[in-house]
Amino acid sequence: MDEDAVPPLGLLLAAHAGGAQASRHRALWAFDARLAKIARTTSEPMIGQMRLAWWNDVIEDSTGIKGQGEPVVDAMRATGACGAPGLVGVIDGWEILLVEPDIDMKGLRDYASGRGGGLVRALADAADAPDWLAAAGQVWALWDLAGHVGDKALGQAALALAVEIL
């Protein structure tokens, strides 16, 4: 997997994970980045949902056949990250951004809970992550969204919700 597939923050945090966990963390950050690209480049929500459904099929494929040759999939499988808890939540979080053009506060909460909460559960390899860890993931997801979204009002709403969660 090309390290360019991993955002800089993910590379930094993976480096701090160290050892075998570093590769696993890079794969998980690349997974989130790949889903972000789907959300960013999809103009038709149904097409985006189909692309996200493919990723869902990949992480639930116990045979290890689906997605072979795709660098992020291969990295996730090589590090055992495909079985990590929270991955479906990450997909669900990104899907909210695809299907809700006028996202409200509930939608933002669901997005943050799915994407951020799911990613930190996957990184920690803990299905029952403590509330503070899930909250940290939610705040990160909202902060990241605010920094990348073109809609100023949505970015401000995301930051306001992040402050509320803190």
Residue ranges: model-predicted function:
Residues M1-L166:
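Acidic catalytic motifs of isoprenoid enzymes
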